[in-house]
């Protein structure tokens, strides 16, 4: 299972990717008040990935806040070779993401935010389908819900109380 135990971001060489920046307008008595919201994904391309959101009056500050939030929200993704261990569906709100393992060399068949998550997680071969909501925040959250459900063969064998060899039969 993709563990959500605390992962120290200082020990990892993290890259980041800004997925979305939204301008938010609040109408007040004196006119319109503008703010910005940023969605950022961070990862080390070796099985650790996280996402975060940040809001501020200026875009760079919103991105900085989102990066800090993403580093606090890291998960570990089990990777088998260059792909994920099994098919999974992640759901968050109206967003649904189906992730399927792919043969080596097929690449990341995913669009937008899902591709960014997979690249930063270090998954080189995967197929995905986005169902339902396609807003970037829902897509990223649904992708993370799916990644959290992943288990490798050792974890499944341990949960069932059998050997890994017995699972392959």
UniProtKB/Swiss-Prot annotation:
GO terms for biological process: translation. Residues 14-77 form the S5 DRBM domain. GO terms for cellular component: small ribosomal subunit. GO terms for molecular function: rRNA binding; structural constituent of ribosome. InterPro entries: Ribosomal_Su5_D2-typ_SF, Ribosomal_uS5, Ribosomal_uS5_bac-type, Ribosomal_uS5_C, Ribosomal_uS5_N, Ribosomal_uS5_N_CS, Ribsml_uS5_D2-typ_fold_subgr. Keywords: Ribonucleoprotein, Ribosomal protein, RNA-binding, rRNA-binding. Belongs to the universal ribosomal protein uS5 family. The N-terminal domain interacts with the head of the 30S subunit; the C-terminal domain interacts with the body and contacts protein S4. The interaction surface between S4 and S5 is involved in control of translational fidelity. Part of the 30S ribosomal subunit. Contacts proteins S4 and S8. With S4 and S12 plays an important role in translational accuracy. Located at the back of the 30S subunit body where it stabilizes the conformation of the head with respect to the body. This is Small ribosomal subunit protein uS5. It comes from Limosilactobacillus reuteri (strain DSM 20016) (Lactobacillus reuteri).
């Amino acid at each position: 299972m993709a563990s959500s135990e605390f992962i120290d971001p200082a020990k990892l060489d993290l890259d980041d990717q800004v997925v979305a920046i939204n301008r938010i307008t609040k109408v007040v008595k004196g006119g319109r008040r503008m703010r910005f919201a940023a969605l950022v994904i961070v990862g080390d391309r070796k099985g650790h990935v996280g996402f975060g959101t940040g809001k501020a009056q200026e875009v760079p500050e919103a991105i900085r806040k989102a990066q800090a939030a993403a580093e606090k929200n890291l998960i570990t993704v089990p990777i088998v070779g260059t792909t994920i261990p099994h098919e999974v569906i992640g759901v968050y709100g109206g967003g649904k993401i189906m992730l399927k393992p792919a043969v080596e060399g097929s690449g990341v068949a995913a669009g937008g935010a899902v591709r960014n998550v997979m690249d930063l997680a270090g998954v080189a071969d995967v197929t995905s389908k986005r169902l339902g909501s396609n807003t970037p925040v829902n897509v990223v959250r649904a992708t993370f819900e799916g990644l959290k459900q992943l288990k490798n063969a050792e974890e499944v064998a341990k949960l069932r109380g059998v050997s890994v060899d017995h699972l392959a039969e």
